[in-house]
């Protein structure tokens, strides 16, 4: 008979951001526990609110299946003495297995006889297994923990009640001073204690007591209510899924409502208004059909519609001081100049072991100029880049960013425009933070992209210079995210930058621009290169590239991220070519022999007069044609051209002994192979490819 089981953990209200990951964790842990305990089940439905984590398991088996197990004991020579009597080792072994020496049989393993006992293990009833869920619950981990009373358990919030029902029967267990039963609690203010008669009654019973336990249903209810208000007022709403998720995990019985604020606050920049309402009050902003922000908001109450007018007035009243503060900061910030804000950065620390934020900008400016010149920016772009790099952190010392840190960069762009900076400079001030997450949007402007790369490179070089290198999961300054952002930007723009060479050049440029800072930019250069290679591997992993392709393109002296990314995609595009095995094997044979020859650059010379077979001339002509056509070809076309050399290469190896006794002939042949091997370098170490 299949059973249903309800588990509910009732808690003090949890922070909204931990509700969803917590219920996912509980579901995974319980599923793993049942699997480990050999209890079959069909499905687990997860439910969550700010005050509860619950699972409804369907199709549970009656019991564990019985198990017949053959248990290995000591060797026969240890189990019996010379007269064939059972030793203490044999007697102790059988006693431990709930058997007697009469149950012993011998089995040979690798030429040695061992004692074995056959055991029949009776499966435990499902209720007995479920009673062990207390350990599953208390083993959960959370980003923040707390204790309560005199108890030593660390948990996300105090546990107030537990429900454990197998069909209509309680499966009791204890966590601290709380015993699992059938009593749950409804809405904190609207509900009461609720007795659950049977596991499958759970959702309906709580809905009758003002709790929607199904998070998906609750979210849909919120969206429907908000959309109804939007339609009623002929508004438009930009759905903010992050805010919707947060609000959903703040309420158990949602009731949406609309409020208004004074029209005068619309004079504030939109990001300021939106931040004041969204981040501080969890309000949804609304617009008209022309996209203009309206002096109104939508919020969601954790309760019903009783006295909703008072709730609306209260929310409107709370919003006003927020908007007044924002208006004050905005007005006051415009009474100073950008240069005055920049000067204040001398007293803002980037890191106490590195420099002030002012000095960081000076380093970044030198880096940005060097980078801009290498990437071929126009004179106007270089001028805009220089100006942007001179001011791009200025908004950190404004009152608005001091109050709303999440607006850094955004307010920088707004203020820069108001202070007369051109569009390119203002946009770069905002874009230098991008991407703000691993999959975040990239800068859209050339100047902004160069500044973003330069700023992040400075952070990485600076922290590596003072030996503050990320290790394990420890990365307090988000250097991995910044390096990953650099890789993404370079690959997206197809900007070729040799990171190892650039770091050496950056050291010289920064030391000339800021000689007093004393940072050795070139310190730990190999570690910096490896750091970026690891970020490339991360990128390739997310692109689901084969491991051998990743190994091939990263096992190389090439430190140009854009080139490595392009090479990886070229190899991936050809991985299923019909003739790839023969083609790659021919090229890898060339590479290995060239490496074995180990000729110096000066010794690599091909003399046609030393050719002894037609195939040598054919390969020489083919390689030269390959090199001559290289400039006008894409990387994919270059790789295809290399693969097409396979017949010529194979004939060459058939007709010629590379390691000829004649030193001149040998070196001539090795020179030709070395030149060809050099043409494969752009694709990494082809020897790493697995071809079938």
UniProtKB/Swiss-Prot annotation:
GO cellular component labels: cytosol
InterPro entries (alphabetical): Gly-tRNA-synth_bsu, Gly-tRNA-synth_heterodimer
Subunit-level organization: Tetramer of two alpha and two beta subunits.
Presence of keyword rRNA-binding: no
Organism (species): Limosilactobacillus fermentum (strain NBRC 3956 / LMG 18251)
Subcellular localization: Cytoplasm
Superkingdom of this protein's organism: Bacteria
Gene coding for it: glyS
Reactions listed under catalytic activity: tRNA(Gly) + glycine + ATP = glycyl-tRNA(Gly) + AMP + diphosphate
Entry GO MF terms: ATP binding; glycine-tRNA ligase activity
Taxonomic classification: Bacteria, Bacillati, Bacillota, Bacilli, Lactobacillales
The protein's Enzyme Commission number: 6.1.1.14
Family affiliation: Belongs to the class-II aminoacyl-tRNA synthetase family.
Keywords per UniProt: Aminoacyl-tRNA synthetase, ATP-binding, Cytoplasm, Ligase, Nucleotide-binding, Protein biosynthesis
Pfam families on file: tRNA_synt_2f
Protein name: Glycine--tRNA ligase beta subunit
A biological process term (GO) from this entry: glycyl-tRNA aminoacylation
Signal peptide: none
């Amino acid at each position: 008979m299949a059973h249903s089981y309800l588990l509910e953990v009732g808690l003090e209200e949890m922070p909204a951001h931990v509700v969803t990951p917590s219920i996912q964790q509980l579901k995974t842990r319980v599923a793993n526990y049942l699997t480990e305990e050999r209890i079959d089940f069909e499905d687990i439905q997860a439910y969550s609110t700010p005050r509860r984590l619950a699972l409804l398991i369907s199709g549970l088996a009656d019991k564990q299946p019985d198990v017949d197990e053959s248990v290995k004991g000591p060797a026969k020579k240890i189990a019996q003495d010379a007269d064939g009597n059972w030793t203490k080792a044999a007697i102790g072994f059988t006693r431990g297995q709930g058997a007697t020496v009469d149950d012993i049989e011998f089995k040979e393993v690798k030429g040695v006889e061992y004692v074995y006992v056959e055991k029949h293990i009776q499966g435990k009833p499902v209720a007995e297994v479920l009673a062990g869920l207390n350990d599953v619950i208390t083993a959960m981990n959370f980003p923040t923990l707390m204790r309560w009373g005199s108890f030593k358990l660390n948990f996300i919030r105090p546990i107030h009640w537990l429900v454990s029902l197998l069909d209509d029967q309680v499966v009791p267990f204890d966590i601290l001073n709380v015993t699992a039963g059938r009593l749950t609690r409804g809405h904190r203010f609207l509900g009461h204690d609720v007795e659950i008669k049977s596991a499958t009654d759970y959702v309906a019973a709580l809905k009758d007591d003002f709790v929607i336990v199904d998070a998906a249903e609750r979210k849909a209810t919120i969206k429907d209510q908000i959309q109804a208000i939007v339609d009623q007022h002929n508004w438009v709403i930009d759905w903010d899924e992050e805010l919707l998720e947060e609000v959903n995990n703040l309420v158990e019985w949602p009731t949406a409502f609309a409020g208004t604020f004074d029209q005068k606050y619309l004079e504030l920049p939109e990001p300021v208004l939106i931040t004041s309402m969204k981040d501080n009050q969890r309000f949804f902003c609304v617009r008209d059909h022309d996209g203009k922000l309206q002096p109104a908001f939508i919020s969601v109450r954790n309760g019903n519609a009783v006295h909703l007018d008072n709730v609306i007035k209260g929310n409107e009243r709370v919003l006003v001081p927020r908007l007044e503060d924002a208006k004050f900061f905005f007005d006051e910030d415009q009474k100073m100049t950008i240069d005055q804000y920049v000067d204040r950065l001398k007293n803002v620390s980037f890191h106490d072991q590195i420099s002030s934020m002012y000095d960081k900008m000076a380093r970044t400016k030198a880096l940005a100029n060097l980078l801009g010149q290498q990437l071929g920016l126009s004179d106007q772009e270089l001028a805009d880049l220089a100006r942007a790099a001179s001011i791009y952190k200025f908004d950190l010392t404004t009152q608005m960013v001091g109050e709303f840190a999440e607006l850094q960069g955004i307010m920088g762009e707004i203020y820069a425009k108001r202070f007369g900076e051109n569009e390119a400079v203002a946009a770069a001030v905002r874009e230098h933070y991008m991407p703000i997450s691993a999959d975040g949007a990239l800068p859209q402007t050339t100047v902004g992209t160069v500044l973003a790369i330069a700023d992040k490179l400075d952070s990485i070089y600076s922290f590596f210079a003072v030996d503050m290198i990320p290790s394990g999961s420890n990365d307090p300054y988000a250097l991995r995210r910044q390096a990953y952002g650099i890789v993404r930007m370079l690959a997206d723009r197809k900007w070729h930058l040799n990171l190892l060479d650039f770091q050496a050049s950056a050291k010289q440029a920064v030391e000339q621009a800021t000689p007093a800072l004393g940072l050795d930019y070139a310190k730990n250069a190999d570690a910096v290169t490896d750091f970026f290679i690891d970020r490339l591997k991360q990128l390739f992993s997310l692109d689901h590239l084969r491991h051998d392709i990743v190994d091939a393109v990263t096992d190389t002296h090439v430190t140009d991220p854009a080139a490595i990314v392009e090479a990886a995609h070229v190899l991936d595009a050809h991985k299923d070519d019909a003739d790839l095995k023969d083609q790659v094997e021919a090229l890898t044979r060339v590479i290995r022999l060239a490496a074995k020859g180990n000729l110096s650059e000066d010794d690599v010379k091909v003399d046609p007069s030393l050719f002894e077979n037609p195939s040598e001339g054919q390969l020489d002509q083919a390689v030269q044609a390959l090199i001559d056509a290289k400039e006008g070809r894409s990387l994919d076309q270059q790789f295809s051209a290399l693969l097409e050399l396979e017949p010529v290469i194979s004939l060459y190896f058939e007709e010629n002994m590379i390691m000829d006794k004649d030193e001149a002939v040998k070196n001539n042949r090795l020179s030709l192979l070395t030149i060809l091997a050099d043409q494969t370098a752009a694709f990494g170490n082809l020897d790493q490819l697995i071809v079938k």
